Amino acid sequence: MTPIPAELRDLVATGPMTHLSTINPDGSPQVTVIWIGLDGENLVSGHMTRQRKLRNVERDPRVALSFDAPRVPGVFLNQYAVVRARATIEPGEAAWDLLNRLAKVYMNPDAEFPAPRGSGYVLRYAVERIGGVGPWVSASR
């Protein structure tokens, strides 16, 4: 597992919309926009239903995550991160708690996650490689 550099942790804390890429049974990519957070040394996301992305991860845990850094006016190429990881699925009520915590980042500090409390799934991403354009690239090499 590759440690997550402080610069990438800082980016994740800003609440970037994240693209999760999984592999469909036919080998084609499946991409979903998700909320992302940190839990110790792992990136994590919460999901209340067992959607295609979860079924794909059950079959093949290899995933890619990508997210843009906040735009800097006048810069030619915006910073972004691409993370290759292996995902594991953790069923339970921790998913709602995670989504409620992330709602405060992605929506507003007083927000509550709008879905009813219940069981769901936490995807935990063990980072294998970090790429993109930004300080997290040199920090991870």
For each predicted feature, which ranges?
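Extreme N-terminal tail/first-helix region
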Residues: 1-17
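Charged, gly/pro-rich active-site loop segments
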Residues: 2-3, 74-141
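Amphipathic alpha-helical interface surfaces
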Residues: 8, 50-53, 95-98, 102
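A generic structural signal for nonpolar/aromatic side chains embedded in well-ordered alpha-helices
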Residues: 11-12, 56-57, 102, 125
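Short beta-strand segments
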Residues: 15-49, 65-68
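Helix-adjacent hinge/juxtasegments
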Residues: 46-78
